[in-house]
Amino acid sequence: MNYGYQKKTTLPFDKVDNLIRKSLSKVGFGIISEIDIQKTFKEKLDINYNRYKVLGACNPALANEALNIEPEVGMLMPCNIVFWENKDKSVTISGIDAEKQLSNTNHNDLIKIGQDVNKLLKEAIDAIK
């Protein structure tokens, strides 16, 4: 499945966690939610899962623009960035395809915002070497 833009890095998980937050901030996104899947699965299900985080990222200017066009679009927010540690200790980083998600609205102005979001998320992810 292709839910968004993805890349792999050999950087350690904790380093990726730190760098992706900084990189998202540089392109105008703040982190408004965070889920530590490994911790949550251990606490709730007593399952040992690989290291995996979900960051809910929001660009306030683009969110404001989208909500002014269609208030219901808030159900599609925030933009999720996920990263997980693979068996070989590499880390995969993936950002939602906002254009694809917003194409369901059939509203050209929202689709354009999705394109802008994708460009910024790709820039943030590509900054992780």
Language-model features and meaning:
Residues 17, 59, 118-121:
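Short amphipathic alpha-helical/adjacent loop interface patches that line ligand
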Residues 1-27, 126:
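Terminal, regulation- and interaction-focused segments at domain boundaries
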Residues 80-107:
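Beta-strand/loop substructures that line and gate deep hydrophobic ligand-binding cavities in soluble
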Residues 30, 36-79:
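Compact, glycine-rich, soluble single-domain proteins
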Residues 21, 38-39, 122:
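Short glycine-/small-residue-rich flexible loop motifs, especially phosphate/cofactor-binding loops
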